[in-house]
């Protein structure tokens, strides 16, 4: 976050000393920007989650974080209470700038927005500063709400709370000419969970977010059109809002510059951007873990995470993404099992996994870097002084500039939205492989788990939904900031469109949450299918072995039969054949298992030579007995094994419990109560996905996600 020069001793001594040192040794702020990116992205996300949960946010003016803004914004979703506190040490600086405005007014000093008109009409002059502020708030109340407290034309209340917090933080720095009592009143509104109603649209975030912020000012001044929403969701007028929040002294009569101080800032755009980035950072880490789980259930080759590969590419986001995936896969029971599969007939299998898995660190790395850089840019913005003019008490002057231009918001939100769309594209590519039996290394088509695949289409509808989500997300990736229109009589001829871009990015976050929850449920389905596969294949293998011993070992008169040598190859067929190609009817002659088992016997018979002419040594003569016995036994054994698994008593436990990715599976299956989806059950995929989506939205998923990575030391595995 960007430090300002402490002019009136209104930050505590320790912070002030640090800020002065930085201003001397790092006058361009580049060193501070670089320092803010030290350490891993994961450590930063852990810190965000911890900050989000703290019940108290203390404002100094220059230390606010994205996580703190998101915390206050989402107060409705927090089980514990919350409170915003203002640093008392800031009072003197705030008062000094307010006094300066009143003194300059009394001396007849000409100052923008105090004695002049606004924007393109600043050539007008007045000595009635209070009336001018009143008119400012009135003409900026140009928004449209529609009907209802949360209509499609009302800014989400979370974004409004974020804007209130950020605006207080800016004004605390003492450059804006506003009374401390007004900041205390806004704080009381936040702490009482009273949220002014702001219009969703109507700002270009260029002279700040003028129109929406004017509705906060309207509530503070008691405008009759002002509305707020109380703690219970009821609609309040200004009188009721002040009473519930215990704001004493009545409505504020704005002094010169105070109206401008309230509305001329970027708080709505940067507040919403803070909410968006808190979620975006978590979603980025989540997808790193989901990509590793994808590698597990797809029997992927883990060498794509090897440190040397990524070290030679140099990009820190890529290196960290690979290291996190490597950590999840290191020691994974799935990886160990997959290694054995890859050793079987290696020349008949692809040497490499497809790009959606193999290049996932290279794809994700730049997106993480973009999101992290955007987070730092917004943290600098929410700690900036962004109104006009700035009151420099130390030099006894008002400085006219353009810090209200919200370009950092528009640019960072456009970039973040593009990064989210890229994450979504990779997620869809992985999902498409996961549900397609041509690519998913033996999982059933559509991840169907029922007994009758003709009446079970699993995740087919979910795949269509994912295509829809991904398409909308790709559309949202289009930039907002290249659609600028010259505004306000060509005075605001360039404008940032910061809030519009933040709103579109909030939409992108919601869509990526839909995709992530759908994908996570599908991955859990795949995990359970691998468990089912392992149990059923074990039964098939044992049954084939037993039937082979019973029917192929002994001849008609008790002698050892040459067919006994077929057993090893029969079991190799079972090992090689994907279970779900025959599991619904294991002895069907149209399915590959029985066809290939018969072919083994036929091949041996063809090699049996003259012995085939002897009925007692003929292998052909044994085929019928072998198949009849298998037909009588195998379907029952397979069904019995399936029933044991469904009752919670499988002979082989689920491998996922031995993996670092287990906490996410545990959340989905145990804590949220989802289950393996089959055609026989009434529950639909959407019902299960809804549970995970809700958990994602209320933060319930954060602890299990971070638990997956709790033992990571922040470095890749050494090159051996």
Curated annotation (Swiss-Prot):
Q: Per the UniProt record, which EC number(s) apply here?
A: 4.3.1.24
Does the record bear Nucleotide-binding in its keywords?
no
* Coiled-coil parts of chain: none
**Lineage: superkingdom:** Eukaryota
What this protein catalyses is: L-phenylalanine = (E)-cinnamate + NH4(+)
**Gene3D superfamilies named in the record:** Fumarase/aspartase (Central domain), Fumarase/aspartase (N-terminal domain), Phenylalanine ammonia-lyase 1, domain 3
Keywords, in A-Z order: Cytoplasm, Lyase, Phenylalanine catabolism, Phenylpropanoid metabolism
Main subcellular location? cytoplasm
Query: Which Gene Ontology terms describe the biological processes this protein takes part in?
Result: cinnamic acid biosynthetic process; L-phenylalanine catabolic process
Disulfide pairs?
Answer: none
What InterPro entries does the database record attribute to this sequence? Answer: Aromatic_Lyase, Fumarase/histidase_N, L-Aspartase-like, Phe/His_NH3-lyase_AS, Phe_NH3-lyase, Phe_NH3-lyase_shielding_dom_sf
Its biological purpose is as follows: This is a key enzyme of plant metabolism catalyzing the first reaction in the biosynthesis from L-phenylalanine of a wide variety of natural products based on the phenylpropane skeleton.
Q: What is this protein called?
A: Phenylalanine ammonia-lyase 1
Q: Which organism is it from?
A: Solanum tuberosum
